[in-house]
């Protein structure tokens, strides 16, 4: 396939591989919101999910395929006719659909997982690609565990699947085993030795088990690969995937070395990472490359002196280049609905009239509690008010009493449980423990609290606190989040949100017969 020799295609798999990261599950509305942000970011392809895995995933992939424009939408599927059919049904509504089928090629996978001989694996791969090519000319084939596969066997498989109709060949480092120099050699070898390699785009998908995901991806691009499969903030299975923002900024900042470019709008990198962080309730680590809070912080006196004289002494890129600008005041107590609507449009939220009214009312309530409302506050409100699941449980009222007299903290809670108002009160070791105990008593659940974290959304003593909790019960886990200037109220909202997600997940599992 002919492409610009220096143009890298960015294939984002946050919605599929990224969502496999523990605690990163998203509901349908959150997936669509993130997909639209990926569209704004300028990725070439987004992998929307694995349609054959569940009815919920099928519906999400189909909804994303309908929602986004100007970007290819891929559905992942095993090298099986039923999987391929299901993937096509989900993505065919997209402007430019792609079927992404995969099959393992390493000796350990062929022997112990597939229980197939190499000749049989070649036949399966060819049959899968031919089946997919009946639907579309945009077919990607991945050789699972390629980095532990025999290079000559990879060449044999790749030649066969290209002849069968594959237009993208993906070489994954599935378990993060490869080293950069070694992986670069492998990519160069398969491109140079596959007779029809000029008819396909070669791609890489690197995991981060040894911390080499980004380094291996860059080595592969230098060696001739022209598609990088990545995720926002590097989230994904186990230790994660190669990070989109790190790959993009490495190419952007060191264009002199790589002589490569991509179509990503770098100014959208930080807003995209921030959005993902808020959706999945996982804060961006302060020392995270490119987008962490410390990425552009300079504490050393020598560094500060150099920065004051010339920013280039210690900055190889600017905060502005990734969209990390000074937080601007956007909404105040007396702001009107148009101001809120304009800010939502600017942030990339396309809301219906009823949703706009809901957010506007929430903004006004928040403005009564804190003096200044920032972009991050607005985004937190949208995620909480618009993109939440339909509530089985809803917090109506909360009252907490604490003292230093030795009396345990008490909580009184009023909740709407499936349309019925219920009240209860109780004690706890601390105020948050008391609140969680009473909520659990009201809804008749006693999940295990696996994680609790709180972060300030913005600065100032009146800042909203964003609380994230992870609950586990009956083998299922769910992450919930809530925000409010009152940390105890934010905690209660997060707990109820997680309970709703847990109930929804159990309902979906019952439908799937799991």
UniProtKB/Swiss-Prot annotation:
Q: What GO biological process, any one, is recorded here?
A: L-leucine biosynthetic process
**Requisite cofactors:** Mn(2+)
Report if keyword Manganese is assigned: yes
- InterPro entries linked to this entry: 2-IPM_HCS-like (IPR050073), 2-isopropylmalate_synth_dimer (IPR013709), AIPM/Hcit_synth_CS (IPR002034), Aldolase_TIM (IPR013785), LeuA/HCS_post-cat (IPR054691), LeuA_allosteric_dom_sf (IPR036230), LeuA_bact_synth (IPR005671), PYR_CT (IPR000891)
Q: Which reaction does it catalyse?
A: 3-methyl-2-oxobutanoate + acetyl-CoA + H2O = (2S)-2-isopropylmalate + CoA + H(+)
Q: What is its EC number?
A: 2.3.3.13
Against PROSITE patterns, the record matches this protein to: AIPM_HOMOCIT_SYNTH_1 (PS00815), AIPM_HOMOCIT_SYNTH_2 (PS00816), PYR_CT (PS50991)
Q: Which SMART domains match?
A: LeuA_dimer
Kindly list the positions annotated as binding Mn(2+): 17, 205, 207, 241
The protein's GO terms of the molecular function aspect are: 2-isopropylmalate synthase activity; acetyl-CoA C-acetyltransferase activity; manganese ion binding
Highest taxon of the source? Bacteria
Keyword Transcription regulation applies:
no
Task: Name a Pfam family for this protein.
Answer: LeuA_dimer
Pyruvate carboxyltransferase domain residues are 8-270
Residue ranges, annotated region (Regulatory domain): 394-514
Q: Offer a single GO CC term for the protein.
A: cytoplasm
Q: Which UniProt keywords apply?
A: Amino-acid biosynthesis, Branched-chain amino acid biosynthesis, Cytoplasm, Leucine biosynthesis, Manganese, Metal-binding, Transferase
Q: Which residues form a coiled coil?
A: none
Pathway(s): Amino-acid biosynthesis; L-leucine biosynthesis; L-leucine from 3-methyl-2-oxobutanoate: step 1/4
Q: Where in the cell is it found?
A: Cytoplasm
Instruction: Give the similarity note.
Output: Belongs to the alpha-IPM synthase/homocitrate synthase family. LeuA type 1 subfamily.
Q: What does this protein do?
A: Catalyzes the condensation of the acetyl group of acetyl-CoA with 3-methyl-2-oxobutanoate (2-ketoisovalerate) to form 3-carboxy-3-hydroxy-4-methylpentanoate (2-isopropylmalate).
Question: What interactions and quaternary structure are annotated?
Answer: Homodimer.
Protein name per UniProt: 2-isopropylmalate synthase
Protein's gene: leuA
């Amino acid at each position: 396939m002919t492409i610009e020799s220096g143009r890298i295609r960015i294939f984002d798999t946050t919605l599929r591989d990224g969502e496999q990261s523990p605690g990163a599950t998203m509901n349908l509305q959150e997936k669509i919101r993130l997909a639209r942000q990926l569209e704004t970011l300028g990725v070439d392809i987004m992998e929307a999910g694995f349609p054959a895995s569940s009815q919920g995933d099928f519906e999400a992939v189909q909804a994303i395929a309908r929602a986004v424009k100007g970007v290819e939408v891929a559905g992942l599927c095993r090298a099986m006719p039923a999987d391929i059919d299901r993937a096509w049904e989900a993505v065919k509504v997209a402007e430019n659909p792609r079927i992404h089928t995969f099959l393992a090629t390493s000796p350990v996978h062929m022997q112990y997982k597939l229980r197939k001989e190499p000749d049989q694996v070649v036949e399966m791969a060819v049959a899968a690609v031919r089946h997919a090519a009946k639907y579309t000319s945009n077919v990607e084939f991945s050789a699972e565990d390629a980095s532990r596969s025999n290079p000559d066997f990879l060449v044999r498989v790749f030649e066969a699947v290209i002849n069968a109709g594959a237009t993208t060949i993906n070489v994954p480092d599935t378990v993060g085993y490869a080293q950069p120099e070694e992986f670069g050699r492998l990519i160069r070898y398969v491109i140079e030795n596959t007779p029809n390699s000029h008819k396909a785009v070669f791609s890489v998908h690197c995991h981060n088990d040894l911390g080499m995901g980004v380094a291996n991806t860059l080595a592969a691009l230098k060696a001739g690969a022209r598609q990088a499969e990545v995720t926002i903030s590097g989230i994904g299975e186990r230790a994660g995937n190669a990070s989109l923002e790190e790959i993009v900024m490495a190419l952007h900042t060191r264009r002199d070395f790589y002589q490569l470019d991509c179509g990503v709008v770098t100014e959208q990198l930080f807003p995209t990472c921030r959005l993902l962080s808020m959706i999945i309730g996982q804060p961006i680590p302060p020392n995270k490359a490119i987008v962490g809070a410390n990425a552009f912080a300079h504490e050393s006196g020598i560094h500060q002196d150099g920065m004051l004289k010339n920013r280039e002494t210690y900055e190889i890129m600017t905060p502005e280049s990734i969209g990390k600008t000074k937080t601007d005041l956007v909404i105040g107590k007396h702001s009107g609905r148009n101001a809120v609507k304009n800010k939502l449009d600017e942030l990339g939220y396309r809301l219906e009239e009823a949703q706009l009214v809901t957010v506007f009312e929430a903004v006004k309530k928040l403005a009564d509690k804190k003096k200044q409302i920032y972009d991050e506050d607005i985004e937190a409100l949208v995620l909480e008010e618009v993109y939440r699941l339909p509530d089985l449980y809803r917090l109506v009222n909360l009252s907490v009493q604490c003292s230093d007299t030795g009396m345990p903290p008490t909580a009184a809670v009023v909740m709407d449980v499936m349309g019925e108002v219920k009240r209860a009160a109780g004690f706890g070791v601390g105020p948050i423990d008391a609140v969680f105990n009473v909520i659990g008593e009201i809804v008749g659940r006693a999940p295990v609290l696996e994680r609790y974290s709180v972060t300030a959304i913005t600065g100032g003593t009146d800042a909203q606190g964003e609380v994230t909790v992870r609950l586990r019960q009956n083998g299922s886990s769910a992450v919930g989040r809530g925000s409010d200037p009152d940390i105890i109220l934010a905690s209660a909202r997060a707990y109820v949100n997680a309970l709703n997600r847990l109930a929804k997940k159990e309902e979906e599992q019952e439908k799937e017969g799991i």
